[in-house]
Amino acid sequence: MSLCLISAGVTKTLAVAAFTLVWTHSIEKIDWRENWRVTPQGLELVEARVKGSGAGMEPPPEARLVDGWFVWQPHRVPMPEVVLGNSGKAGEWRLCTKGTCRTLSTILGHDVGPHPTTMRACD
């Protein structure tokens, strides 16, 4: 399995089984991170963490504080695809694998700008 990213008619395939999606909240200006796994059933959200709370980003009651991050395991079924929007007010989505993070624009080879990006598991 691989991860496919699709935006503005461009598709990139990344040979990864797991990745971290990172973004900066547009109002609070703090990072939110999600660990994902690519499975035959779709994209599975394994863990979420945030460095603070407020402005609609409160961690759930089961979150625990670990090294300054609120961490929890969302309980969701794998999703066939995830669509990422871009407000333009908080910088870009970043995708991290093997300790390296890159913006979606860098990965896709064009300025993502206002275009949504679809993530899905692919062969």
What are these regions (language model features)?
Residues 4, 8-60:
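N-terminal secretory signal peptides
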Residues 59-123:
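Mature, soluble, non-transmembrane domains
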